[in-house]
Design a protein with these regions (language model features):
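A feature for loop-to-transmembrane-helix boundaries and adjacent hydrophobic helices
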Residues: 1-155
Length: 155
């Protein structure tokens, strides 16, 4: 996280304001919404919770002094949620075949990766889609296939 090797895109999107936890968020958001489009583009503090990485880090050298989405933290939280789903819900399921929890992990991780990829700087594209999205969809399809194949009693 502090090294800045895994970083998100600049936090310009309207969706990104949902995650703010600063106390004066509503004042900031109201003021920001009153700006014209050109003023919004030049606004110095686009999101109050963005992370400015040191210029010596890869993220800081690519986006100097610019607040970025902390994509690695988003992924951490989503992976913890996925772990709790697997540990407290799926592992207690009866009549599961071998590999059952593994395939569910692949599905949950792929969904997490699809979500987090919207906040990351991705250079690798497959046609007009980001490569992690394509790979994740393929992994979800393969996992569902094996879950249905190996767990006929479950479905």
């Amino acid at each position: 996280f502090m090294n800045g090797e895994v970083h998100g895109v600049p936090t310009f999107t309207p969706f990104s304001v949902i995650f703010n936890v600063k106390p004066k968020f509503y004042e900031w958001y109201t003021y920001y919404q009153s700006l014209s489009i050109s003023d919004k583009a030049n606004y110095p503090d686009l999101v109050p919770w963005g992370v400015v990485f040191p210029t010596s880090s890869p993220a800081g050298s690519e986006f100097p002094n610019l607040a970025l989405h902390p994509a690695m933290l988003y992924e951490l939280v989503l992976n913890l949620i996925g772990f709790f789903i697997i540990w407290f819900i799926l592992r207690k399921k009866k009549n599961k075949a071998s590999g059952y929890m593994w395939w569910w992990y692949i599905i949950i991780y792929s969904i997490n990766r699809i979500i987090v990829s919207f906040f990351r700087v991705e250079d690798l594209m497959f046609f007009n889609f980001r490569a992690p999205h394509v790979i994740s969809i393929i992994l979800i399809a393969v996992s569902i296939f094996f879950l249905k194949k190996d767990n006929k009693k479950v479905f």
